[in-house]
Every structure is written in structure tokens, then in C-alpha cells.
A protein has these predicted regions:
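Cytosolic juxtamembrane N-terminal segments of multi-pass membrane proteins
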Residues: 1-10, 77
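Transmembrane-cytosolic junction motif
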Residues: 5, 44-69
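Hydrophobic or amphipathic, alpha-helical segments that drive membrane association/targeting
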Residues: 10, 36, 44-47
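Canonical alpha-helical transmembrane segments of integral membrane proteins
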Residues: 11-30
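Hydrophobic alpha-helical transmembrane segments
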Residues: 26-42
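Charged, low-complexity intrinsically disordered regions
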Residues: 71-77, 85-141, 149-297
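Conserved oxyanion/phosphate-binding beta-strand-loop segments in alpha/beta enzyme cores
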Residues: 80
Length: 297
């Protein structure tokens, strides 16, 4: 199917669901109850067989958005960068830092390449939604516990953006920055307090090499991390890790600009442009880290 037909089909579908359907419902509700009841008894019969076609249209548009819009903005940053929608960070790589607890997730929408002599991979890590069985219990206390469990899992489990950078220099020790929103208290290393009070208020720092940690966490780098966190929105929690020869950056809660659901605003070129801006912002972290590593030789 041609690009023009895909866009036309998606636009027609969104017009019906966004404008026509609500107007029709309003008219019906203003009329007699019998008409309302009759129509809504018929709607499931009409709609149900067409759900696969709706899903197919949405999937076609998502594929078009990724293969055209996203691929274009990634190539515009650097023609040597690679965008692979079906690839992403592995579970072993993700849990290496020990910042987040283990949950089922899948990695996708990987952007990789070399920037300033540093190999990097940027991808989405999307958690698999859990199901909670009520076991038929009507006990209000058990219901409260289930709700608490859902809220706790939503708060603790990671779902967002991950950046992995491979530097030319091995780190002697391990240094981890955990956003204070992360409740994990089993992170390895001794807790370190830096001179930057504002940074200490936002992050907990753990390291087994305090000298190296202070070189890596330069004032410029700490400022860059704060700017990234602010740029992704106040709801995002940011954590990071230096280990072996790699730097890991975790943005939990970052908006997934590669996907949309049935009732979301349709993805557009502006969303792809936002991806480009976010990538450029993250790459500036590499520039700052290279400066820190040049000092720490």
C-alpha cells in the first residue's frame, strides 16, 4: 500500500472517531432513550468485525511513521546513525547496574552509532503490563492491598528510555547515581556526598572509587544531567551508572514518542522532531563526559 493511501486511511479513521462519533452520540442522547438503546445494541455487532481492520490501519501508520519520519530525523542528525525499530537493550545489559528491580520488559526502537569517538545505543525499554488476580474476593482490605500493589509496581518498575555509551577508557571503579525517586536501597558501593547541594538533593551517589567519581561527576556534567532531566519533564526520574567501560543513563517515565494508541493524538512530524531534539540533548552528555575523561587521565 502506498504512503498516500496509508495516511488517508488513518486520517479518515481519526476523523470519524474524533469528530463524527461524538456528535452522533450527542444527537442520540438528546433523542429518545429507545433510539439510544437500539443503536448501542447494534453498534457492537457492526464494530466488532471491523476491529481487526482498525488495528491493521493503525499498525500501517505506525510503520509508516517509523520508517519515514523517524528514520529521516535520525539520518538528519548523522547519516551514519542506524535506526532499528525491532531492536533494543537486552535484559542482561539493562540490569547490570542493579538500580532497578527485575521485571518483564522488551527493548525496541534502537538508535545506534558513533558520536565523538564514542559508540552509543539509545532505545526504549517498555515494561510488560502485569495482571492482578482478585480471586473473587470482596474483602475491602484485600482490595486495598491490591490497589497498593498496583501503585507500588507502577512507581518502582522501569519503563522509559535508556542510553548506553561505550568509552575508549575503562573505569577503575563503579559509580552509580540513583534518582531519589528510586527506592532501591541495595545498590553496591559506599554512599558519597558531593559539594553540589542541589545535586545531592536530587540524587544518591554510590561508588567504590571516590577519587574517580569526583572526576567523572564534574560540575559541567552534573549541570548537564539536570538539564536533561528538566528537558524530559518533571515526571521523569533520571539515574546513571559508570561501570567497566560503559556509561548508562536511565530515564524512567520518559514519553514514548515512537508509539501511539487508538485514543492518543496521532503521531506526526512534530513528534519525530521532538525525538531529534531529545537525541541531540543526550549526545551533549557524551561531549561533557569526554571533557571529564580528558582531565582524568
Amino acid at each position: 500500500m502506498s504512503v498516500k493511501k496509508i495516511v488517508k486511511k488513518y486520517a479518515t479513521f481519526m476523523t470519524i472517531t474524533t469528530f463524527v462519533a461524538p456528535i452522533l452520540i450527542f444527537i442520540i442522547m438528546e433523542r429518545r432513550f429507545e433510539i439510544f438503546f437500539l443503536l448501542f445494541a447494534v453498534i457492537p455487532i457492526y464494530v466488532t468485525p471491523r476491529i481487526p481492520k482498525v488495528e491493521e490501519t493503525l499498525e500501517e501508520y505506525r510503520s509508516f511513521y517509523k520508517n519515514v519520519f523517524v528514520s529521516t530525523v535520525v539520518a538528519d542528525i548523522d547519516s551514519n546513525f542506524t535506526y532499528e525499530p525491532q531492536k533494543g537493550i537486552s535484559a542482561n545489559e539493562f540490569y547490570k547496574s542493579g538500580i532497578y528491580r527485575r521485571v518483564n520488559f522488551y527493548g525496541e526502537d534502537q538508535i545506534s552509532g558513533t558520536y565523538a569517538n564514542v559508540k552509543f545505543q539509545l532505545s526504549e525499554a517498555i515494561k510488560v503490563e502485569k495482571t492482578y488476580d482478585s480471586n473473587g474476593s470482596k474483602d475491602p482490605y484485600l482490595a486495598l492491598l491490591r490497589v497498593s500493589k498496583v501503585i507500588y509496581d507502577e512507581y518502582m518498575d522501569f519503563s522509559g528510555t535508556v542510553l548506553v555509551c561505550e568509552f575508549y577508557k575503562n573505569f577503575k571503579g563503579q559509580t552509580i547515581l540513583a534518582d531519589k525517586k528510586v527506592l532501591n536501597t541495595k545498590i553496591s558501593g559506599e554512599k558519597e556526598i558531593l559539594d553540589d547541594t542541589e545535586f545531592n538533593n536530587e540524587f544518591r551517589i554510590f561508588t567504590d572509587d571516590k577519587i574517580e567519581a569526583r572526576y567523572l561527576l564534574s560540575p559541567g556534567f552534573m549541570q548537564r544531567l539536570r538539564e536533561v532531566k528538566q528537558g524530559f519533564g518533571g515526571t521523569v526520574s533520571l539515574s546513571a551508572a559508570f561501570m567497566d567501560d560503559k556509561f548508562y543513563l536511565f530515564l524512567n517515565g520518559a514519553k514514548n514518542r515512537f508509539e501511539s494508541s487508538l485514543f492518543d493524538t496521532p503521531l506526526s512530524l512534530s513528534d519525530a522532531q521532538a525525538i531529534k531534539d531529545e537525541i541531540s540533548q543526550l549526545l551533549r552528555i557524551i561531549d561533557e563526559l569526554n571533557l571529564s575523561l580528558d582531565v582524568y587521565k
